[in-house]
Amino acid sequence: MNGAVPMLAIDGPSGAGKGTVAGLLARRLGWNLLDSGALYRLLAFAAVNHGVDLTNEEALKVLAAHLDVQFVAADGSHGQRIILEGEEVTDVIRTEQVGAGASQVAALPAVRDALLQRQRAFLEAPGLVADGRDMGTVVFPDAPLKIFLTASAEERARRRYLQLKAKGADVDQSALLEEIRERDERDSQRAVAPLKPADDAILLDSTEMSIEAVVETIIRHCERQGWDV
């Protein structure tokens, strides 16, 4: 890892607000942004489009290595537009169905290996904010600042419910809660790169915090690193 480039790793479970927080921090700091979860969502989405079974590890490995994807800076909660094979898929890949597929393919060792260098390539000047589930433990283990952002499963389900309702979706909050609990178990129990805080990560529980408060808290930690914020 390029130690001369400032690096902030944000990990945490599904629905903790990592993507929104990372996007806001990247804009605030003027840094590059890596939404690693989007890569796994893109792979699951592309696999379905190309008729690749989500359990076919070898085929998924090949697809992961050749994903034709572009991340374009933009306004909005995620801070970027995502272009896959020439078509914008920014919102399409955010569905619960694609998320479940992403969690499934992310458990495959060959897939994680195929995407590892692709993720590390995002580390460029002036700095990088990376969010995911193994940023501080596997992808960027030497990151000088690591945040593990979490919230109760109930609060994460509530946030997701409000988010989906705002988009006009017909959703059941209790079903969302069950899905979140199942995904937490799957992500934390997988054999490769399980979801867990890095030993040197700062734990931040956002259950009772606003997005703005979370961002400001992390900014204070950035200041302690001596970074220009």
Swiss-Prot record:
It is an enzyme of class 2 (transferase). Keywords: ATP-binding, Cytoplasm, Kinase, Nucleotide-binding, Transferase. SUPFAM superfamilies: P-loop containing nucleoside triphosphate hydrolases. ATP binds at G12, P13, S14, G15, A16, G17, K18, G19, T20. The keyword Transferase applies. Its EC number is 2.7.4.25. Gene3D superfamilies: P-loop containing nucleotide triphosphate hydrolases. InterPro entries: Cytidylate_kin, Cytidylate_kinase_dom, P-loop_NTPase. It catalyses: CMP + ATP = CDP + ADP; dCMP + ATP = dCDP + ADP. GO terms for cellular component: cytosol. The keyword Cytoplasm applies. It is found in: Cytoplasm. One of its GO terms (biological process) is pyrimidine nucleotide metabolic process. GO terms for molecular function: ATP binding; CMP kinase activity; dCMP kinase activity. Belongs to the cytidylate kinase family. Type 1 subfamily. This is Cytidylate kinase. It comes from Pseudomonas aeruginosa (strain LESB58).
